[in-house]
Amino acid sequence: MLVPKRVKFRRVHRGHMRGEAKGGKTVAFGEFGLQATTSSWITNRQIEAARIAMTRYMKRGGKVWIKIFPHKSYTSKGVGVRMGNGKGAPEGWVEPVKRGKVMFEVGGVPEATAREALRLAQHKLPVRTKIIAREAE
């Protein structure tokens, strides 16, 4: 699973998710990509589940590029814990994905296989997505 090797601070602010992604909005490496149409946090477990779904369907053919990395920790407190007493313990890692960001790319397989693999990955993610093809240069 994807986790940072080292971080300067264990707990970070939640931040805002306004507007569109600044970069990474086009297919850069493969032939097809999975682009977010809504914004959300995506956990390292969700990224891994999508990766496994794609690679299992493609059966060792082609290549998958993961263009997001969960660099932000999220925290939570226990169920019966009262308010106050500081921020909770780090629970996991997330990547804030804004709309327009291409999260996964697939290449080296026929179009039908690539589209089906990306469709399987869509079901593992908490954002609405669309499958896009590389633009002819």
UniProtKB/Swiss-Prot annotation:
GO molecular function: rRNA binding; structural constituent of ribosome; tRNA binding
Classification via InterPro entries: Ribosomal_uL16, Ribosomal_uL16_bact-type, Ribosomal_uL16_CS, Ribosomal_uL16_dom, Ribosomal_uL16_sf
One GO process term, biological-process aspect: translation
One Pfam family, short name: Ribosomal_L16
Keywords: Ribonucleoprotein, Ribosomal protein, RNA-binding, rRNA-binding, tRNA-binding
Top-level taxon of the source organism: Bacteria
CDD domains from the UniProt entry: Ribosomal_L16_L10e
Subunit structure: Part of the 50S ribosomal subunit.
Function of the molecule: Binds 23S rRNA and is also seen to make contacts with the A and possibly P site tRNAs.
Protein name: Large ribosomal subunit protein uL16
Gene name, Swiss-Prot/TrEMBL: rplP
